[in-house]
Amino acid sequence: MNANNTLDLTPHFALDGDQPFKDRRAMMPFRGAIPVAKEQLAQTWQEMINQTASPRKRLVYLHIPFCATHCTFCGFYQNRFNEDACAHYTDALIREIEMEADSVLHQSAPIHAVYFGGGTPSALSAHDLARIITTLREKLPLAPDCEITIEGRVLNFDAERIDACLDAGANRFSIGIQSFNSKIRKKMARTSDGPTAIAFMESLVKRDRAAVVCDLLFGLPGQDAQTWGEDLAIARDIGLDGVDLYALNVLSNTPLGKAVENGRTTVPSPAERRDLYLQGCDFMDDAGWRCISNSHWGRTTRERNLYNLLIKQGADCLAFGSGAGGSINGYSWMNERNLQTWHESVAAGKKPLMLIMRNAERNAQWRHTLQSGVETARVPLDELTPHAEKLAPLLAQWHQKGLSRDASTCLRLTNEGRFWASNILQSLNELIQVLNAPAIMREKP
């Protein structure tokens, strides 16, 4: 609020010209949360798992922190793949699950989606993948229609591993292809060439036993509208159930980030990435695929994308594995990232916690409603604040700049607005927090 007790919307206006924002902004995790003291972690965890679940959907996330190679763009690399280390990790991961599976919290509500992330979950052996999936199905209350996603890559994801996942109960595969172009794949340190990646995806689809989805990245070095269009056409023609189109996020600590900083390579500008995204949206629309969220498209009814949708809606998430993060009943936590420390905690029969954060807000659900609304391009602002009309000048300006379909307080994003969704989310998050603050706080000079 300014000195006249009116909301200053101008810092959130879109810029003049072809590009409404300088770059895409990112929302920070644990925003507004209070850390639990280190000496209170164990006690707090016991209190958490002895409480029943809140009336929300529930998810499970498992982190597999091993990769055979370090892709140049990836900021999630933790540990190099080793067969013995993976087998040992599986033993400990199952122990972590079993340690708390019988708790009040874990048994108090059905689980609607399970996600194996990493790292590279498909690097585990067929036997170990089956063991983990079987443990989850036997020990936790998975819903009958629970979505069980295995994230993987082409390298080493052989028929034995795939069939072991399917036989154990996995029903969705998400494969990080990123690009089918052999030259671009080589620059990213992807070991398989384009034809090999295509053949792998085709073989996965032909099994016809699970939803098959692939990730494609836009904004990669050497990528242009032509190569991007070729990737989109291949994804369309393979027979996939769904596809994810993600913008490359250049992280300073990655090999690619360092190469960009040193001038050894270049990546498309924000405006060029925007154009590639719009190209992808138009292509998927012309192909008849339905837009599930800002980055996800489905071709068949098999593809539900439950985990990604529900996590944006504020679903509770149980988390297992080194580096895994979860949230439940107003608390968020992160497991130990250091593999040795994680192993030592599990071996001692302790939850391998690195930190726990407590949400300071009494009612934070509006943030989840906002986030999920932006993610699906429809934000009913009147349901988030009784003062939505105060946002009218901003909504009108965004509409004028092509970010929304109209200027109403039910914000409906265009494809342009979808690309800049993180900026819109950040602005609305800040503004609604001010609008919903007690009047005495809004009136402070």
UniProtKB/Swiss-Prot annotation:
Signal peptide: none annotated. It is an enzyme of class 2 (transferase). GO terms for cellular component: cytoplasm. Keywords: 4Fe-4S, Iron, Iron-sulfur, Metal-binding, Methyltransferase, S-adenosyl-L-methionine, Transferase. Its EC number is 2.1.1.342. It catalyses: 2 reduced [flavodoxin] + heme b + 2 S-adenosyl-L-methionine = anaerobilin + 2 oxidized [flavodoxin] + Fe(2+) + 5'-deoxyadenosine + L-methionine + S-adenosyl-L-homocysteine. The keyword Ribosomal protein does not apply. S-adenosyl-L-methionine 1 binds at residues 61, 118, 151. One of its GO terms (biological process) is porphyrin-containing compound biosynthetic process. InterPro entries: Aldolase_TIM (IPR013785), Coproporphyrinogen-III_oxidase (IPR034505), Elp3/MiaA/NifB-like_rSAM (IPR006638), HutW (IPR026332), rSAM (IPR007197). It comes from the Bacteria. Inhibited by exposure to molecular oxygen. Residues 52-287 form the Radical SAM core domain. Involved in heme degradation and iron utilization under anaerobic conditions. Catalyzes a radical-mediated mechanism facilitating iron liberation and the production of the tetrapyrrole product anaerobilin. Can use heme, mesoheme and deuteroheme as substrates. Belongs to the anaerobic coproporphyrinogen-III oxidase family. ChuW/HutW subfamily. This is Anaerobilin synthase. It comes from Escherichia coli O157:H7. The gene is chuW.
